[in-house]
Amino acid sequence: LKERYLPRMLSNDMDELWRCAQFLTEQGAGSDVGNIEVMARAEGDHWLIDGDKWFCSNADAEVILLLARTEGAVAGSRGLSMFLVPRELDDGNRNHYRIVRLKDKLGTCSMASGEVTLDGAVGYLIGELNTGIKQIMKTVSLSRLSHGVRAAAMMRRCLNESRQGARNRCQSGQ
């Protein structure tokens, strides 16, 4: 998997770069990911994934990372595994999932968020079975930090723009 997917996921060449998506949320499993119902069943060297994801960030990306429950896994978050799901299969055909609807959300024009149905989509296990929650929490924790840093930078910019505007303001010719 690393040889096949990582070079394009990490490329600095925008013509070669594959965009990535994260599919976690389901209609009945928003903030409680332990309720995830999307199922993955082993099929040779890959897995077939079925179910619906609800708020899929960057839904039209070339590569998806998603959490699913494998057959026979324990209930709750300890039974979740992470899978890589390519948009296109090795034979050039599209994988077996479809974007049902794009969400009309404020502030996400550059990254479509949508509802996706997986109908036997081919996926590849990343890491070990039942470690998906640990893997995704590392990513989520890092993204929370970056959101905080961006918010602080935006506040500083707003303060600087306001100061500059106040210093250079003319009122009644003065």
Feature-to-residue mapping (PLM):
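Short Pro/Gly-enriched beta-strand edge/turn motifs at strand-loop
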Residues: 18-25, 48, 95-101
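Alpha-helical interface subdomain recognition
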Residues: 1, 33, 43-46, 117, ...
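A glycine-rich, basic-preceded beta-loop-alpha segment at the flavin cofactor/substrate interface
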Residues: 91-100, 112-143, 160-174
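Active-site-adjacent "gating/activation" loops or surface patches in catalytic cores
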Residues: 15-17, 30-33, 41-48, 109-134
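Internal maturation/activation junctions in enzymes
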Residues: 1-38, 42
